């Protein structure tokens, strides 16, 4: 893994920082990347590009909270792609969770979502955001019921799920051409730290093997099909495409 510093800016977080550094098997060495425990949350910083700002997970406020309240509910393309309809709340495995935005949208609409995240730094950010959201007075109740996280390689996690989800959702990292300033910032930090999803093509057959009803792959509108496998249908949005592979066994 790329070297990363773990820093406790808040003295009360010193023990948590030490535990995280041990878990990540990181010494307190110099690195352009730092996981920083502040008073409010855990955040990732690229120290040699401070203008990029910090990256952290926040399910309670900001863009994801706005989308939960005003994003179109079950009429959203992602909801249609996973098969959300009246009386049907699919169980979903998000095998490429990242910062958990899509998983959160699906959970807020009623899905039971298990997030898988391969990179330990991203998983640490996600775990912190999840814990804070579960303690929130407004959304904590259903967050505890509907969202969970497993860290580790996606392929291994898929093969060792122990249950059959209705849907496996894939959104492998892809070089984005046009994105909002926020995502551009995050992509620059992420791609230099995390790297590309080199096993992305292999994820599709693995997902098809474990999903009960469908596999959904989110792609930029200009990207080819994952693993060059043509889906049964596609749902197009302004800048993305949801390729849907329906399971027939």
Swiss-Prot record:
Cited Pfam families: SAM_MT
Entry EC no(s): 2.1.1.242
Binding site for S-adenosyl-L-methionine: 101-102, 117-118, 171
InterPro entries: 16SrRNA_methylTrfase_J (IPR007536), SAM-dependent_MTases_sf (IPR029063)
Protein source organism: Tolumonas auensis (strain DSM 9187 / NBRC 110442 / TA 4)
Role this protein plays: Specifically methylates the guanosine in position 1516 of 16S rRNA.
Name of the molecule in the record: Ribosomal RNA small subunit methyltransferase J
Species lineage: Bacteria, Pseudomonadati, Pseudomonadota, Gammaproteobacteria, Aeromonadales
GO molecular function, one term: rRNA (guanine-N2-)-methyltransferase activity
Keyword Transferase: yes
Record family assignment: Belongs to the methyltransferase superfamily. RsmJ family.
Catalysis performed (reactions): guanosine(1516) in 16S rRNA + S-adenosyl-L-methionine = N(2)-methylguanosine(1516) in 16S rRNA + S-adenosyl-L-homocysteine + H(+)
Keyword set, alphabetical order: Cytoplasm, Methyltransferase, rRNA processing, S-adenosyl-L-methionine, Transferase
């Amino acid at each position: 893994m790329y070297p990363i510093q773990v820093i406790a800016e808040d003295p009360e977080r010193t023990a948590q920082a030490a535990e995280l550094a041990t878990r990540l098997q990181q010494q307190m060495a110099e690195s352009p990347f730092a996981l920083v425990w502040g008073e409010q949350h855990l955040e990732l910083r690229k120290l040699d590009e401070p203008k990029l700002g910090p990256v952290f997970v926040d399910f309670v406020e900001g863009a994801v909270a706005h989308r939960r309240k005003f994003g179109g509910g079950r009429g959203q393309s992602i909801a249609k792609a996973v098969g959300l309809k009246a009386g049907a709340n699919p169980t979903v495995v998000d095998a490429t969770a990242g910062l958990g935005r899509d998983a959160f949208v699906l959970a807020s609409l009623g899905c039971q979502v298990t997030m898988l995240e391969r990179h330990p730094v991203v998983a640490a950010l996600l775990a912190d955001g999840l814990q804070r959201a579960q303690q929130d007075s407004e959304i904590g109740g259903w967050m505890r019921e509907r969202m969970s996280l497993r860290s580790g390689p996606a392929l291994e996690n898929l093969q060792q799920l122990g249950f059959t989800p209705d849907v496996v959702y894939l959104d492998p990292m892809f070089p984005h051409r046009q994105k909002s300033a926020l995502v551009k910032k995050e992509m620059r930090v992420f791609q230099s730290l995390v790297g590309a999803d080199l096993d992305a093509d292999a994820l599709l057959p693995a997902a098809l093997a474990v999903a009960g009803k469908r596999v959904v792959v989110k792609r930029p509108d200009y990207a080819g099909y994952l693993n060059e496998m043509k889906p049964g249908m596609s749902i197009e949005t302004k800048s993305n495409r949801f390729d849907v592979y329906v399971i027939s066994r």
